[in-house]
């Protein structure tokens, strides 16, 4: 685990950068929109919530900020968001997939009607929506000489079990899977992919449990704290002469950032380093050989081709 501390000097690297953010009207997304905009970025954000989005526009003024009504579960809607940003500015440099939902009602409740199909909104928004965002982001970032950055939004539930929230847990594990599945390919194309995993954050999601949580003295993030980690991910590779944020190891890609009590910690590198302990040394050694085999240029999953 490595503590990450923002280097304010790197914020200047955001000046004139074009940033696309999903779920930018409220909560963490709104804080991310604000932080990027305050540091000179041109921000195009999407959301289904029109009224809060208009409030964001009013608070930040009319320059370098645009809202595009967008439903993350719709591929066509996300395409429109990105196409609008590219049409406005001619490029896209940074993408933050922040849109997310949570349903506190358990689909495994013994009192639930088994004949009623359960809602999969969390899967559709959090996982499939993030896949859509990442896919379209790759298309546009490939057009840049220096690639770009994709920042995904998971949760502590993306790597830690929590009772009752099964679809939400599944969806956020899926977002971590997007990072792990994409970052190696993206790195070859100069594109960095990272994922932020906050613990309890003061947003609409925790209204029902906030009082008891705080009374017990448990840590709470503010949405601005999580937005700061998004910005760290988006700027860690943009410093001159190898300069980066305190604790960041370059190249900063394929990282998982745990956010607790307002502070960010990179945990993916340590997870990988400890693999021989939790998987077993021999298993880890054989797995590494298999991964090397699958990384060969001639390797293919296509059943009609031979690797």
Residue ranges, per PLM feature:
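C-terminal helical subdomain
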Residues: 195, 215-306
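Active-site helix of classical SDR
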Residues: 134, 171
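Residue(s) in the substrate-gating loop at a strand-loop-helix junction
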Residues: 155
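Active-site-adjacent segment of SDR/Rossmann-fold oxidoreductases
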Residues: 39, 160, 181-191, 200, ...
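Conserved glycine-rich Rossmann-like NAD(P)H-binding loop of the short-chain dehydrogenase/reductase
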Residues: 39-55
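Conserved mid-core segment of classical short-chain dehydrogenase/reductases
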Residues: 102-120, 164-167
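Canonical Rossmann dinucleotide-binding motif of NAD(H)/NADP(H)-dependent dehydrogenases/reductases
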Residues: 6-44
């Amino acid at each position: 685990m490595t503590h990450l501390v923002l280097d304010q000097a790197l914020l200047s690297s955001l000046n004139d950068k074009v940033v696309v953010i999903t779920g930018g009207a409220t909560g963490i997304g709104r804080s991310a929109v604000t932080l990027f905009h305050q540091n000179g970025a041109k921000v195009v954000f999407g959301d289904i919530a029109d009224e809060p989005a208009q409030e964001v526009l009013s608070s930040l003024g009319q320059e370098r900020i645009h809202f595009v009504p967008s439903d993350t579960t719709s591929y066509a809607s996300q395409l429109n968001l990105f196409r609008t940003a590219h049409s406005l500015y001619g490029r896209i440099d940074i993408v933050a997939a922040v849109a997310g939902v949570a349903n506190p009602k358990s689909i495994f409740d013994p009192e639930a009607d088994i004949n009623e199909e359960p809602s999969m909104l969390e899967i559709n928004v959090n996982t499939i929506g993030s896949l859509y965002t990442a896919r379209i982001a790759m298309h546009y970032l490939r057009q840049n000489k220096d690639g770009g950055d994709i920042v995904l939004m998971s949760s502590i539930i993306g790597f830690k079990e929590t009772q009752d929230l099964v679809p939400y847990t599944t969806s956020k594990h899926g977002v971590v899977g997007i990072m792990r599945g994409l970052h190696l390919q993206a790195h070859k194309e100069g594109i960095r992919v990272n994922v932020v995993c906050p613990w309890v954050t003061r947003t609409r999601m925790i209204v029902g449990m906030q009082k008891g949580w705080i009374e017990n003295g448990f840590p709470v993030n503010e949405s601005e704290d999580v937005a700061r980690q998004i910005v760290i991910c988006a700027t860690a590779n943009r410093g001159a002469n190898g300069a980066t944020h305190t604790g960041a190891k370059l190249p900063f890609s394929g990282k998982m950032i745990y956010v607790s009590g307002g502070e960010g910690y990179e945990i993916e590198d340590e997870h990988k380093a400890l693999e021989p302990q939790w998987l077993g040394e021999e298993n880890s050694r054989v797995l590494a050989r298999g991964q090397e085999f699958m990384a060969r240029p001639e390797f293919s999953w296509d059943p009609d081709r031979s690797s």
